[in-house]
């Protein structure tokens, strides 16, 4: 089944012209001096940014977020999708729901509407995005859902340009692409636990399917390279459900569902908290990383009628209503992430590091209709396959994560302009 490309992006207003005026002011300040008595001089005729408001009062430039873009509900968007399953090569087969016969298309025709935001959350503008990241680098650090997110971004940007493969190693788990026109590089780093891990030895005839997780050692497969990137988006979640033995100081301290003698079951929540604490510490301790780190919060699965290996499925065709409760596990994982983020953020302020939160858990929890389910493979495939209620169809709800990402990048750009204005006026 092929989707119809149905919309183009509206032109976006330029960011605040206050900075331009401020620059001009420095060269003609004698002529404009009387105008400086007006505290709103830089804001006249200029609407607020969609993600922040800039004020100039008593000679002090300040900014505050105009609303919480992460609290809201899904509303119909008949203009979507903005790419199709036939126009984007970055879609992996198991996320190509249209190709494998998903009969409905309503699940791709929604957008996120934040509560109390006059301008809402604008749909993704690929040109605007590429202008912001011109000459910069961005890394997606995490598991296959992180890669799913990155592939969505590549598909959205394909309306403007296709990237060239710039990978430094022949490994599909560690890929890099460059948008040559914009000198923008995007990369994927595979690290499902964020910390150092050892997979079960599948070659043993009676292997035990248990991971070894070194909770106090960040995975060097990503920490060794983050200094090369301006933006790092980290996430992790579903792999922590798997049975694991926990190590700290290279000594076993407990496990999650390992069912091994003389080892205390500390639950997955213990390991999850420790893994994020270690990942944040690696960012904060890095002398080479000078960029912005974004935590993209947990994107929950939506199995109903059983677990992934017990016939569970996700067959809903509409989003949940905003007042429908999250499951207890998702709520607890989300709470742990926020607590560890806030803890790290306080330390980041002391060190001059920039940590930001993409708190998308509520939005993604409300989308049980967006997973591949049985439509991520050939229907008659003669192999044992499970319904996929973890990853997301492309196009699909995960595209909206990039609406959030662009909004956050705009905020960061606004903060940069504010710093320049303050410097000019000091």
UniProtKB/Swiss-Prot annotation:
This is Protein trichome birefringence-like 19. A motif (GDS motif) lies at residues 142-144. The keyword DNA-binding does not apply. GO terms for cellular component: membrane. InterPro entries: TBL, TBL_C, TBL_N. It is a single-pass type II membrane protein. It comes from Arabidopsis thaliana (Mouse-ear cress). Belongs to the PC-esterase family. TBL subfamily.
């Amino acid at each position: 089944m092929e989707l119809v490309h149905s919309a183009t992006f509206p032109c976006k207003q330029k960011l605040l012209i206050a900075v331009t005026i401020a620059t001009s002011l420095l060269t003609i300040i004698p002529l404009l001096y009387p105008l400086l008595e007006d505290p709103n001089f830089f804001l006249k005729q200029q609407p607020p940014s969609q993600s922040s408001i800039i004020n100039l009062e008593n000679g002090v430039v300040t900014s505050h977020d105009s609303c919480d873009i992460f609290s809201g509900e899904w509303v119909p968007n008949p203009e979507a999708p903005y790419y199709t399953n036939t126009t984007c090569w970055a879609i992996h087969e198991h996320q190509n729901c249209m190709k494998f016969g998903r009969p409905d298309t309503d699940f791709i025709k929604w957008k996120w509407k934040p509560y109390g935001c006059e301008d809402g959350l604008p749909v993704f503008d690929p040109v605007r995005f590429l202008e912001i990241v011109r000459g910069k680098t961005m890394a997606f650090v995490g598991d296959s859902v992180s890669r799913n997110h990155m592939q969505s971004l590549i598909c959205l940007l394909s309306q403007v340009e296709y990237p060239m493969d710039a990978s430094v190693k022949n490994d599909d788990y560690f890929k890099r692409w460059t948008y040559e026109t914009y000198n923008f590089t995007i990369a994927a780093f595979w690290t499902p636990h964020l910390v150092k891990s050892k997979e079960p030895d599948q070659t043993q005839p009676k292997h035990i399917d248990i991971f070894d997780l070194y909770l106090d050692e960040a995975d060097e497969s990503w920490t060794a390279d983050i200094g090369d990137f301006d933006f790092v988006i980290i996430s992790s979640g579903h792999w922590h459900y798997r049975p694991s033995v926990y190590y700290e100081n290279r000594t076993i301290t407990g496990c999650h569902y390992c069912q091994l003698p003389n080892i205390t079951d500390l639950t997955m929540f213990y390991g999850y908290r420790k893994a994020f604490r270690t990942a944040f510490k690696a960012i904060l301790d890095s002398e080479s990383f000078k960029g912005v780190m974004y935590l993209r919060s947990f994107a929950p699965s939506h199995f109903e009628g059983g677990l992934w290996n017990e016939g569970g499925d996700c067959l809903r065709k509409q989003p949940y209503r905003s007042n429908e409760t999250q499951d207890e596990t998702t709520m607890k994982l989300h709470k742990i992430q926020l607590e560890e983020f806030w803890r790290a953020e306080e330390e980041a302020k002391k060190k001059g590091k920039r940590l930001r939160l993409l708190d998308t858990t509520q939005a993604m929890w409300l989308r049980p209709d967006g997973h591949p389910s049985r439509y991520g493979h050939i229907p008659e495939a003669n192999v044992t396959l499970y319904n996929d209620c973890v990853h997301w169809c492309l196009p699909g709800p995960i595209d909206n994560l990039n609406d959030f990402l662009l909004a956050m990048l705009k905020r960061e750009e606004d903060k940069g302009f504010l710093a320049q204005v303050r410097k000019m006026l000091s």
